[in-house]
Regions:
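Nucleotide-activated donor-binding/catalytic signature segment of Leloir-type glycosyltransferases, i.e.
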Residues: 227, 235-257
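Short hydrophobic beta-strand element within catalytic cores of glycosyltransferases
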Residues: 268, 287-294
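An aromatic- and histidine-rich active-site surface loop
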Residues: 72-83, 87-117, 277
């Protein structure tokens, strides 16, 4: 059976959540006998070597177009190519390609499984026009796809209430255990184990990066910020805090052992995401045994449950950081056990893949 995955920057993951999803789901489906192809953009060479036996197909993107137009062109080209390749099921990461769904046949649209992600239009970086387009693409995805997938129950409730259409809950998975307690990453950034905070996120306003920087600075504690800073917001923050000795901008790190080294040696893990959905970076922090302080919203509480502390404002954030900093070993161990139990019960990649296999088989009327 031929499965296509579109809507990401490709595999292996060097960007974010959808790319981590595409990498993990494609490799695992391939090992179960599915013929999986990940479609991803290219600007130079259209031949892409397979990754872990997963085929990769390069979709031409014209480098001289503005980035927004590159994305539009990439989405349309991906769908057009898929129409020729004729896969059995198309897993679409995000709903931005749905602007073009109405122009394709119903037979083609009946293959579309759209992972709606969080509520993209709520992200603070978007202006009025972008929010309108995102709301429109969300509505078109709901109307023209075969199945909507929600990665959290909160998003599932929103989709079913908003669009009166059945949706399926399938979360993301967590990466377990790879990486030594210290593989040299702490030395690279001149860090003392258990004497720094950690944040792993895309450097965007809705992830409350600056709120964390200010809180750790006021408490005179080091904070390591992991995430690509080559964004408008990233450029602002790196310039604004260039002389602040308490913040280290480590850039994007995609080597799992290095990330886990930073996670396992941090005193506090900060998760400020507010835009919704089950966030892979939070799951990975839980799997690594981090002691977590998270923004208090329904998405984070659904994922983390009683495995961390929460904050709604700056005062609560600083109080939570202080509390975690003063945890003894037993308190830290208790939090880690709660996270480990929750992840293994709901958020392993084997659970996620099983749910996608069931969905794929139900759509194609084949037995598991």
């Amino acid at each position: 059976m031929k499965i296509a995955i579109i809507g990401t920057k490709g595999i292996p993951n060097t960007y974010g959540g959808f790319e981590a999803f595409a990498e993990n789901i494609s490799v695992r489906l391939q090992t179960q006998g599915y013929n999986v192809t990940v479609y991803q953009p290219y600007t130079e060479n259209n031949y892409l070597e397979p990754f872990e036996s997963v085929s990769r197909f390069g979709v031409k993107v014209f480098r001289y177009l503005p980035k927004n137009l590159q994305r539009v062109h990439y989405n349309l080209s991906s769908l057009s190519i898929l129409q020729q390749h004729n896969p059995d099921v198309i897993i679409c990461c995000g709903h931005s390609p749905s602007i073009f769904f109405p122009f394709f046949s119903k037979a083609f649209r009946d293959k579309l499984v759209v992972n709606m992600d969080g509520l993209e239009w709520k992200r603070e970086k978007w202006g009025v026009v972008a929010r309108f387009v995102l709301k429109l693409s969300e509505r078109l995805a709901a109307r023209y796809s075969r199945v909507m997938v929600a990665d959290s129950m909160a998003v599932l409730r929103y989709l079913m209430s908003k669009y009166r259409k059945e949706a399926v809950f399938i979360p993301y998975g967590a990466q377990f255990g790879e990486g030594a307690e210290n593989d040299g990453c702490t030395e690279k950034y001149n860090l003392t184990p258990m004497e720094y905070g950690l944040l792993v996120a895309r450097i965007e306003p809705e992830n409350r990066i600056e709120q964390a920087i200010k809180a750790f600075a006021l408490l005179n504690k080091k904070l390591v910020v992991v995430g690509g800073v080559n964004t408008p917001y990233g450029n602002v923050l790196t310039k604004r805090y260039a002389t602040n000795r308490n913040v280290i901008f480590a850039g994007g790190i995609y080597h799992l052992a290095s990330l886990n080294s930073l996670r396992k040696n941090c005193r506090v893990y900060y998760h400020g995401h507010t835009a919704g959905g089950t966030n892979p970076s939070l799951l990975d922090a839980m799997a690594a045994g981090c002691t977590i302080v998270a923004s208090d919203n329904e998405y984070n509480r659904e994922t983390l449950a009683d495995g961390g502390l929460y904050f709604k404002n700056n005062d609560e954030l600083m109080a939570a950081i202080k509390a975690i900093w003063n945890f003894d070993n037993n308190e830290r161990k208790t939090m880690a056990q709660r996270c480990d139990r929750r992840v293994k019960q709901q958020y392993t990649w084997s659970i996620v893949v099983d749910k996608y296999v069931n969905l794929i088989n139900s759509l194609t009327n084949e037995k598991a």
